[in-house]
């Protein structure tokens, strides 16, 4: 892939000078959904698919972007003096947002770039293609300008900062953290309240991770994501009148049951219940994985989906069909929606010998019920973002 991106760069912008290449993965969250902005735990991993970038510094302040995924847009031209969202169409907002964030954080971007990007993350799948683009841009800027004091965790935080403040998307830290800090064959047990984390080896003896992409189009900003977030913030404020906590992630299930009546609205109560119970499920799931109890891990994945469907109400017929059909397939250890919901994808752990049957059976049932096809990807857990040698 690296060579294809370099060839494309040379064709568009010429092959001379110091052209450098970078990679940032996509991510999937195994369990711990809609907990990252509620001060809870998440358990994501980086994937071996992601975003490749070739870049070269310019002597002026011009920016030239080309995406091999959006060839019809051609070369999109901009400048470091035009940090205005929406001027240049959708996708350059992610790299430009990261450049803006570096400037805001005291790391000036004084020269422009020629940039070619290629991503093999399915677009709109919910596997974090925009966070991957942000992170690969952050790695590039750190490398090109020699900003060695910036850590990979800083890059993740700058990515979140640019999403929140440049792109206007109220995301948590999970996506950028998983992409920046990923480790081969491990998932990251991350406490989003303080960014304490540990790597947990994912040993799926005789099984693999299968991503089922619903192909229902959704955008994070225009989905009900922000609505759920504000429902949880209101619920937290109501609980804080009777209990001294900073986030819903601090509550055990028992503590929540004791104070839940402080939440006046039954819908908000359900939202908060999901945040608390999902956090506990995530803690239990990591313990199960450490104990090599993959069956228990799968049960907790299934319970996570039920909660996202019934209490948090972020699934919809597409994701429910993918998951419920998966539950009926032989060899499926666990299956749940992953990501923000309202479309996007599901993650399943499937015994290797049953994968072909799983894809055929779930795929046929989905097409019959929904009217268009789902896509399936058997994925591996890879390392986080970095410079390609």
Where are these regions (language model features)?
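C-terminal nucleotide
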Residues: 1-27, 52-88, 186-334, 349-389
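Short Gly/aromatic-enriched secondary-structure transition segments
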Residues: 39-46, 228-229
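FabD-like malonyl-/acyl-CoA
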Residues: 132, 345-349
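Gly/Ser-rich oxyanion-binding loop with an adjacent helix/lid
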Residues: 1-22, 28-32, 38-41, 80, ...
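Short, charge-rich binding segments
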Residues: 44-46, 54-57, 89, 106
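A short glycine-rich, hydrophobically flanked beta-strand micro-motif that places a catalytic Asp/Glu
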Residues: 113-117, 319, 335
